[in-house]
């Protein structure tokens, strides 16, 4: 197997919003950066595999609230270049934006699988990844490594202290529902409106029942639809279910769609709705949160 070696000042794992911002920030401060992404596409949850919207329009109570800095610059670049208004155009706009950073090099389809530490075990010396594009292994060496993978793959491979799962009660003790939510899965769906009614019958293989979901997840979906019908909507599962870790995107989306079309307060309005598309991958809460020198709380 072919083996390559890369040296840089910083290695960033994951090219979602956090990874892109970290890599671009470091490159603009003068560091040489290697950005690793296991998938063939940029964007993470806003990429064309997961298809979450970049920004939920109207999701804030403050009319003029917006992100500034690199996120604002990124969004402006997407709005300017994504003339198609779809995820393919968005991914192209992100790629063009990142390629403009001379000190940043992107490695797509590069899966991290090994971490080498120093003799005392308190510092990462190198990471090893398999690259489909380069057809072999790549050793990445740098003084600093940033884990933006979403699943904590670098942190877990390096045996950094941390925890898995979702523990809202740790910081939200005042929340009445905090202890009830132990698992979160999410997908996205795109809705269009037809000129004529379209009936829907739930497939027999879908085991989830939307009424078993947590109340907050059901309300979030209805509020999103009340703001605007056509477009992309986030669908979450916060309730109890068998084989929670194996909840598929199709099960989640079709259970929500069955509820909307046949039993929800919006059933009459939903007669002409069509499910145009949904994300093939499901995001869940079973990631790894490393315990660092600083911990961000909900406050």
Language model: regions and residue ranges:
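Beta1/beta-strand and adjacent pyrophosphate-binding region of the FAD-binding site
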Residues: 4-16
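Conserved N-terminal/central alpha/beta ligand/cofactor-binding core
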Residues: 25, 31-32, 36-118, 163, ...
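Flavin (FAD/FMN)-binding glycine-rich loop and adjacent Rossmann-like elements that form
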Residues: 45, 121-124, 132-144, 148-299
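Loop/turn elements at helix/coil->beta-strand transitions in domains of secreted/extracellular proteins
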Residues: 7-10, 29-32, 102-105, 138, ...
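Active-site-proximal beta-strand/loop segments in catalytic clefts of secreted hydrolases
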Residues: 13-16, 36-39, 130, 148-150
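Structural core of flavin- and non-heme-iron oxidoreductases
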Residues: 22, 82-143, 263-264, 290, ...
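N-terminal Rossmann-fold NAD(P) dinucleotide-binding loop
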Residues: 19
């Amino acid at each position: 197997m072919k083996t390559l070696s890369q040296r840089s000042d910083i290695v960033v794992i994951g090219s979602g919003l956090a990874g892109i911002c970290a890599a671009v920030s470091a490159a603009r401060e003068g560091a040489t950066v290697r950005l690793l992404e296991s998938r063939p596409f940029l964007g993470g949850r806003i990429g064309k595999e997961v298809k979450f919207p970049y920004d939920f329009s109207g999701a804030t109570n403050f009319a003029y609230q917006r992100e500034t800095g690199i996120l604002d610059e990124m969004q402006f670049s997407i709005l300017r270049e994504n003339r198609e208004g779809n995820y393919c155009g968005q991914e192209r706009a992100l790629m063009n934006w990142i390629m403009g950073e001379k000190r940043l090099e992107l490695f797509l389809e590069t899966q991290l699988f090994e971490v080498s530490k120093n003799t005392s075990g308190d510092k990462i010396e190198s990471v090893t990844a398999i690259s489909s594009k380069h057809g072999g292994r790549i050793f990445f060496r740098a003084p600093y490594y940033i884990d933006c993978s979403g699943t904590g793959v670098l942190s877990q491979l390096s045996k950094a202290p941390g925890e898995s799962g979702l523990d809202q009660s740790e910081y939200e003790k005042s929340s009445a529902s905090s202890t009830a939510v132990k698992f979160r899965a999410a997908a996205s769906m795109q809705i269009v409106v037809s000129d004529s009614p379209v009936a829907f019958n739930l497939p027999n293989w879908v085991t989830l029942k939307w009424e078993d979901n947590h109340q907050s997840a059901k309300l979030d979906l209805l509020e999103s639809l009340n703001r605007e019908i056509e477009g992309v909507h986030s669908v979450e599962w916060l309730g109890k279910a068998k084989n929670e870790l194996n909840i598929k995107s199709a099960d989640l989306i079709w259970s929500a769609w069955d509820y909307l079309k046949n039993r929800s307060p919006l059933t009459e309005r939903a007669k002409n709705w069509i499910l145009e598309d949904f994300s093939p991958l499901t995001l869940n809460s079973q990631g790894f949160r490393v315990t660092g020198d600083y911990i961000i709380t909900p406050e």
